[in-house]
A protein has these predicted regions:
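Extracytoplasmic/lumenal domain signature
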Residues: 210-223, 252-274, 288-294, 321-352, ...
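Hydrophobic or amphipathic alpha-helical targeting/insertion segments
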Residues: 101-109, 125-133, 138-141, 147, ...
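Repeat-blade elements of multi-bladed beta-propeller folds
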Residues: 188-192, 230-249, 276-320, 353-379, ...
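Asp/Glu-centered strand-loop micro-motifs enriched in Gly/Pro and often flanked by an aromatic residue
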Residues: 195, 201-211, 216-244, 269-271, ...
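Blade/loop signatures of beta-propeller domains
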Residues: 149-217, 403-408, 573-599, 673-674, ...
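Long, low-complexity segments enriched in small/aliphatic residues
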Residues: 430, 552, 556-634, 644-645, ...
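Topology signature of small-to-medium multi-pass alpha-helical membrane proteins
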Residues: 2-158
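Short, solvent-exposed loop/turn elements at domain surfaces
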Residues: 189, 194-202, 224-229, 253, ...
Length: 825
């Protein structure tokens, strides 16, 4: 007769609890698995759920067969995981992590079964599984999904650098002595260092050999303490002995370049009601009044008004341009109305928060060229996206470009306004002083996700790079990156002006990144592509099938975009949330990039509206011939909501008592005046775990050969320190590749400096290999572009640590500078 083992009460309850957990897991996988299979998805989950349910019931009763059923699930899951995932580490995590963890617990409880397994066997099995866990955890610290530096490609980049070095300059030479056009080596005189927008510094005191010695040199707190809705995103300027920056609410501050101490401050008194969905001031502009203009202004100066020989021009969140004396911070009274110009004049009704300048204006040939942000998603006919050009000395309107009224060149005729709802330019322009052109990265018409009511002029210029002649205010050419945009794929990146090697000569070019991840190279004189652009067929349908373009432009030069999503790309912390994401994927409309939005089911937008490349743009090393691009790799999960339902939900425009959402752009936006509101799940996150449905990495950084467009290296960018399930910051230095906002700086010494990721670090990266050489912890999120300058023979790296509401990084008000110790060689 066989004697059955009766486990202790504690052992019985432990085994029963484990059986219950496994049984519940099985029931969930069975239910969801049947649903997924019915949708045409994977058949793994349903049979795995059956086996786990049986295993759970048997283990609850203490039966040995339960262990065998569970072992069968493990044995079947291993080859299935390899078939779906190959050697991709992050794909293994949700498929095997929980299963192996439960197997480890079961191994420890084997002696408690009805027919007990020996403790030696139990410990051996548990030991093997524990070793698997240790190895798997260690592998998490190895970056996956990248491309290592290749010697052949590096050689090709060196050849390109030789060609670029022979050119006079990789940026257009200045003709008027403006620091923003040709900054001194020690300076950072415009948002992208120069108006060419390359984000390249010729300094090389800090290099690969000593960068690990960087220490905090000084920190300055602006005192404009942010709430969850604010994130300054500012990149300071440095000209001469001073830094110039703006805070989240547009206070302008000058700092001593050596000590970081405040020289002066100007507060334009921007009210909180003027803040759109986030308070961002990405920078200010610097202008040096030419001598001839000084002479013309002498009479004004004699009457006691400040001359403002050098001036800081700032755009504010409430739609003003302000000119300040760079030395004293006092308003330039010869500019507009006592130092201010209201850009909303001529726009008609402009509720607070609807018209905001959040990026520094370009100044070309004495003309301040400004666009503005129009609050997204509220109405079809919001204020105009008109581009305005003002005299940099007097503030007088030189011209205005309203795309639907090309015959208007100044203020609108009496009783009329600039056309409402037209595409706007909310980001930073680039400028060529020699050509007299300003390059405008245009956004979309208001109501991003409904296109039927747009005019032909809107459809021509929306989501385009427009070259405008600053003398006339007229467009010279435009290049469109999305035809009839219904995805919020506006151009967020500042273009970069470069010399591009073609047919043995260097051609004046503009490098244009897009949110879709495309990099276009255009002749900046004509707008013609210097490397092929192919019109490819894209999906049709959606709620406006008659409006969808049959083709879209794809660059043959380079793309940051990854392959289309598949069900296998769905992720999670466990098989359960991964299963939920798989079901959502199968339920949604997805036909690849440019899948049209729908109202009867969700649609997947991939890449999402945060890029690809967004407002941080790219940096360019013109000497080595290398482009550095950090990028996002996340989808959005979108749904058009019929008007009647949106009204019941209370989705109304902000000025109609909608209130302040303070959340992600597009999340419950009413789009009044169209048949549909829009609900965007930006990043496609599950509400409970707050994890993204797509597998990592979610962001990367890449070096690209300028001449050929080939990838030199590509790595996940950003660690999991600031991320984790349920919104808990894990603190783990795992280079998972996180979402990122903000750009990089490249120096002549071969270093990349960048913050941008969600882990609140600023990094130094070797340009030649992509390897991290140094990092420092910031006091808040580093969602801003850094800058580099030198003063009194010492090189400094500066970053604004202000945080970001959508990225959910800590908010702050710190401007932090790093430098080598004084005694360092």
């Amino acid at each position: 007769m066989t004697t059955l083992h009766r486990p202790s009460r504690r052992g019985h309850w432990a085994l029963a609890t484990l059986g219950g957990v496994i049984g519940v897991l099985g029931a969930v996988l069975l239910t969801g698995g049947v649903w997924l299979a019915a949708l045409g998805g994977s058949w793994y989950y349903a049979p795995a759920g059956v086996a786990l349910l049986i295993a759970g019931v048997l283990l609850f009763r203490g039966r040995n067969a339960g262990a065998w059923w569970f072992a069968a699930v493990v044995a079947a899951t291993l080859p299935w995981t390899w078939w779906e995932s190959g050697s991709d580490y992050w794909r293994w995590v949700p498929r095997l992590g929980l299963i192996v963890g439960l197997a480890f617990v079961l191994a420890l409880l084997l002696p408690k079964l009805e027919r007990p397994v020996s403790r030696a066997v139990s410990r051996s099995v548990a030991g093997v599984l524990a070793a698997v866990f240790v190895v798997a955890f260690a592998l998490a610290f190895v970056p996956f999904g990248g491309t290592e530096a290749d010697g052949a490609l590096a050689h090709a980049a060196g050849m390109a650098a030789g060609l670029v070095k022979r050119s006079a300059s990789a940026a257009p030479a200045a003709s008027d002595g403006q620091p923003g056009n040709a900054p001194a080596d020690d300076d950072w005189a415009a948002y992208g260092r120069s108006q060419a927008g390359q984000r390249y510094s010729p300094l090389q005191q800090i290099n690969r050999d000593n960068v690990a010695q960087l220490k905090q040199a000084w920190v300055f707190h602006t005192g404009d303490l942010p709430s969850k809705r604010w994130g300054a995103e500012t990149t300071p300027l440095k000209v001469g002995d001073s830094l110039y920056l703006c805070t989240a609410r547009n206070q302008v501050i000058a700092l001593d370049a050596a000590s970081g101490k405040e020289r002066w401050r100007y507060d334009p008194k921007v009210k909180d009601e003027a803040i759109p969905y986030t308070a961002a001031c990405r920078g200010v502009s610097y202008y040096q009044v030419p001598v001839a203009a000084n002479d013309a202004a002498a009479a004004v100066a004699a009457e006691g008004a400040p001359l403002c020989r050098t001036r800081i021009i700032e755009g504010t969140l409430d739609g003003r341009l302000i000119a300040l004396d760079a030395r004293s911070g006092k308003p330039c009274t010869d500019f507009g109305n006592n130092g201010q110009v209201d850009i909303t004049v001529g726009m008609g009704q402009t509720p607070p928060g609807y018209v905001s300048i959040n990026s520094p204006p370009a100044i070309v040939r004495g003309v301040v060229v400004t666009g503005h942000q129009v609050l997204d998603g509220q109405k079809r006919y919001e204020p105009s996206g008109v581009i305005e050009g003002f005299d940099a000395v007097t503030g007088q309107l030189r011209w205005a470009w309203d795309m639907t009224h090309p015959d208007w060149n100044g203020a609108p005729p009496p009783g009329q306004t600039w056309t409402r709802g037209t595409p706007n330019m909310w980001t930073t322009a680039a400028a060529d002083e020699q050509l007299g052109y300003v390059y405008l990265p245009m956004g979309n018409s208001t109501a991003d996700y409904w296109s039927s009511s747009r005019t032909p002029q809107e459809n021509r210029y929306a989501t385009s790079l427009v070259a405008l002649d600053v003398t006339t205010g007229k467009p010279v050419w435009n290049f469109q990156t999305t035809h009839i945009d219904a995805w919020d794929y506006d151009l967020g990146s500042q273009p970069s002006l470069i010399d591009f090697p073609k047919d043995g000569v260097n051609v004046p070019a503009v490098l244009l990144p897009s949110k879709q991840g495309e990099l276009y190279v255009l002749d900046r004189r004509t707008g013609k592509p210097l490397v092929g652009v192919e019109e490819r067929a894209v999906p049709g349908g959606g709620v406006e099938p008659q409006m969808r373009a049959k083709t879209q432009p794809f660059s043959l030069y380079h793309t940051l975009r990854k392959p289309d999503l598949t069900e296998r790309d769905m992720w999670g912390m466990t098989p359960i949330d991964q299963l939920v994401c798989r079901i959502q994927f199968r339920k949604a409309s997805y036909k690849g990039i440019y899948t049209p939005p729908e109202a009867d089911r969700h649609s997947i937008e991939y890449p999402g509206y945060n890029g690809g490349s967004d407002w941080g743009s790219v940096s360019v090393d013109p000497q080595r011939g290398v482009i550095v691009a950090n990028y996002n790799d996340m989808p959005n999960y979108n749904l058009l909501v019929p008007r009647a339902k949106a009204d019941k939900l209370g989705w109304a425009p902000r000025d109609e008592a909608r209130g302040d959402a303070g959340g992600a752009e597009g999340a419950g936006d009413p789009q009044a005046g169209t048949p549909y509101a829009i609900n965007v799940n930006a990043g496609w996150r599950l509400p409970f775990t707050k994890l993204l449905c797509k597998q990592p990495p979610y962001g990367g950084i890449r070096a690209i050969d300028l001449a050929s467009g080939k990838t030199l290296w590509d790595r996940p960018f950003g660690s999991a320190r600031g991320n984790g399930p349920f919104g808990i910051r894990s603190g783990l230095p795992i280079e998972i590749g996180t979402p990122n906002n903000g750009g990089s700086v490249v120096t002549a010494s071969g270093l990349i400096f960048i913050a941008a990721a969600t882990d609140d670090l600023i990094r130094a990266i070797d340009l030649s290999t992509g390897k991290e050489l140094w990092h420092a912890k910031l006091p808040a999120g580093g969602q801003a572009n850094p800058m580099v300058y030198a003063y009194n023979g010492r090189e400094y790296l500066v970053i604004m640590a202000g945080g970001h509401h959508f990225m959910e990084t800590p908010a702050g008000d710190a401007v932090v500078a790093y430098a080598l110790p004084q005694q360092a060689p």
